[in-house]
Amino acid sequence: MSFLPVIMAGGTGSRLWPLSREYHPKQFLSVEGKLSMLQNTIKRLASLSTEEPVVICNDRHRFLVAEQLREIDKLANNIILEPVGRNTAPAIALAAFCALQNADNADPLLLVLAADHVIQDEIAFTKAVRHAEEYAANGKLVTFGIVPTHAETGYGYIRRGELIGNDAYAVAEFVEKPDIDTAGDYFKSGKYYWNSGMFLFRASSYLNELKYLSPEIYKACEKAVGHINPDLDFIRIDKEEFMSCPSDSIDYAVMEHTQHAVVIPMSAGWSDVGSWSSLWDISNKDHQRNVLKGDIFAHACNDNYIYSEDMFISAIGVSNLVIVQTTDALLVANKDTVQDVKKIVDYLKRNDRNEYKQHQEVFRPWGKYNVIDSGKNYLVRCITVKPGEKFVAQMHHHRAEHWIVLSGTARVTKGEQTYMVSENESTFIPPNTIHALENPGMTPLKLIEIQSGTYLGEDDIIRLEQRSGFSKEWTNERS
């Protein structure tokens, strides 16, 4: 029997700041090796008989998801865009409704996974999923309980009930994150598992329980899916209908109340990578138990996580620290207090600082840009456009733009004119002028963009689809 993977990719990963940002959260990061967490989540399904994955994500991340799927040779036409966040119960309901509408299998088994988890033992993972198959096929709602390796206060727990089959249990209860003493008792008892947030069930089984236990969520999602707007690779859900949907997790909405919940134990080196300390736990270490990534010299140091993006970092005689350097931010924290990193993100949000939103180097489907300098009434960016790529015609009311080509050749549309701009040449785009840019060449186009004007906000962009032969595919992705 085949599975339909449903990958939940909507989180923000704020506890892994400054690497994880709102516009580029942790599920799109490569924490070990070259592949991102999202890509690894999908690749580990290779030994299972699965259909092309359904990915549920924030509208803002749609092109990141599509690009990362294409990089691992997966179809990118099953991406469900949540117009607003409503937690996991509605998100899974959207996938279940879509699966019943579109799947060749009339009632597929949905394998629901988070995009930002790490599983080190893929054989054990596959074995647990296969073991759960018979229960899910017969109408049970299966969750996977991680066998604890220690007393942990950072996870919720599942208490197992009666044995209903070989290494399969009824769910007795879901338990919130405990204090350290209670976590110790759970660990000693052997009856509690970490709540992984991974599930296996038939689409109809989930929707039937949702309809019975949380009818408002069911009705709102049913209506939202009834007004789907296909958009290239993306499945756009009706915003007004979905906004009326209550926000609730699958645990609260369904799993804690259903009579059909089953827990399958799993020992697979699982981590939700919810903090820098948990990332240190799963990373390869040197003989002093340091994790060193980048250009780093460490002497008489132990138990540290040190990451450098583009600077030389030297450390002497320090222990139990997390040091993370990016182009625009530096984090120094005790490994025992890294859960408080979210307070930094909250501070940045309150003060409307860009460091919580995105990196200085920002990747787009057409290429990337890097902010070089900014100040009152000006912004300077270095832009790289991939061969054959383009961004659509647009206009700004309050700013002008100067483009200076460093390498390659640009095809520029300005008003009714279309012309080529070559290396060491420049062009000027006045305010209120329709303009577009394309790289017609075989090599990357690199240029400097200087924005100047009284207002440089990203909401001063009027995009004009289908103008000057430019497709609408990259609309909203220029900025």
UniProtKB/Swiss-Prot annotation:
Segments crossing the lipid bilayer: none
Gene3D superfamilies xrefs: Jelly Rolls, Spore Coat Polysaccharide Biosynthesis Protein SpsA, Chain A
Keywords recorded for this protein, A-Z: GTP-binding, Lipopolysaccharide biosynthesis, Nucleotide-binding, Nucleotidyltransferase, Transferase
Enzyme class, spelled out: transferase
Pathway of action: Nucleotide-sugar biosynthesis; GDP-alpha-D-mannose biosynthesis; GDP-alpha-D-mannose from alpha-D-mannose 1-phosphate (GTP route): step 1/1; Bacterial outer membrane biogenesis; LPS O-antigen biosynthesis
Domain of life (superkingdom): Bacteria
Gene Ontology molecular function: any one: GTP binding
Catalysed reactions, as listed in the record: alpha-D-mannose 1-phosphate + GTP + H(+) = GDP-alpha-D-mannose + diphosphate
EC number: 2.7.7.13
Pfam family, one: MannoseP_isomer
One example of a Gene Ontology biological process annotation: O antigen biosynthetic process
Family the UniProt entry places it in: Belongs to the mannose-6-phosphate isomerase type 2 family.
Quaternary structure (record): Homodimer.
Role played: Involved in GDP-mannose biosynthesis which serves as the activated sugar nucleotide precursor for mannose residues in cell surface polysaccharides. This enzyme participates in synthesis of the LPS group B O antigen.
Protein's name according to its UniProt entry: Mannose-1-phosphate guanylyltransferase RfbM
Lineage: Bacteria, Pseudomonadati, Pseudomonadota, Gammaproteobacteria, Enterobacterales
Underlying gene: rfbM
